[in-house]
Design a protein with these regions (language model features):
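C-terminal accessory extensions appended to soluble enzyme cores
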Residues: 164-221
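Conserved AdoMet/S-adenosylmethionine-binding subsite of the radical SAM
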Residues: 2-180
Length: 221
């Protein structure tokens, strides 16, 4: 696997990969799935970071944080210098609906893992709040994580339906985010699915929703 990674880096080019934002693990499967060799993943991540290629990991799992080799890898003042770890970002999918994910770690366990990475290991972290299963639940997730996440990525539930969310709750939610983000270090990423959801609402509210979403995005320009 390491040889394949090295060959792919040479074939594509390190500069091209960096310009594209680095390597992302992974939308299609969980990189810390119990069936995956987490030690091999750690070595691949090291190879990428050693070449100054940013690495972003998205997972639902938390058990890998108890793996001794991963703990050594993340610990400050170990064989992995801080200047490598600055290019590492780790996020957790947190929707707040444990009943929809009976085989995954609970919301609280994921939040605790996020806190450990952010506060103890000083790793850049993010929350993938996608999909929003309910406005209330999404609001609670944000309240519990915005101080321990460097970013929160927000997306509407698929498929997009006009009656998916109450339009007044949806509007109140995005206005609250707009007002919150101005004073936070945590960056909020509004996914395109939020715009698609806003476009399903009727009347003048549609344009008000889109205007607020635009305001949030412009904060980070």
């Amino acid at each position: 696997a390491l040889e394949i990674v090295a060959k792919d880096i040479m074939r594509i080019g390190e500069d091209v990969i960096r310009e594209d934002g680095g390597i992302f693990f992974s939308f299609t499967c969980d990189p810390f799935d119990p069936d995956i060799d987490v030690d091999m993943l750690r070595m691949i991540v090291f190879v990428l970071l050693d070449r100054q290629i940013p690495v972003t990991i998205l997972t639902k799992n938390v058990d890998w944080l108890e793996n001794d080799k991963w703990k050594d890898f993340l610990e400050p003042d170990t064989d992995c210098p801080d200047n490598l770890l600055r290019d590492l970002t780790i996020g957790f999918t947190i929707t707040g609906k444990d009943k929809l994910e009976p085989n995954a770690p609970s919301t609280e366990k994921r939040i605790e893992a996020l806190r450990k990475l952010h506060d103890e290991y000083k790793i850049k972290t993010f929350v993938s709040l996608e999909p929003i299963t309910s406005i209330h639940t999404a609001s609670e997730v944000i309240k519990k994580t915005y101080e321990i996440a460097d970013g929160i990525r927000i997306g509407a539930q698929s498929p997009i339906k006009k009656d998916r969310y109450d339009p007044y709750e949806f509007f109140g939610f995005i206005v609250a985010i707009r007002n919150l983000v101005r004073d936070l270090d945590c960056r909020f990423m509004i996914k395109d699915s939020m715009y698609k959801q806003a476009e399903t609402f009727l009347g003048a509210y549609r344009y008000m929703y889109i205007e607020v979403l635009d305001e949030i995005r412009k904060i980070y320009e």
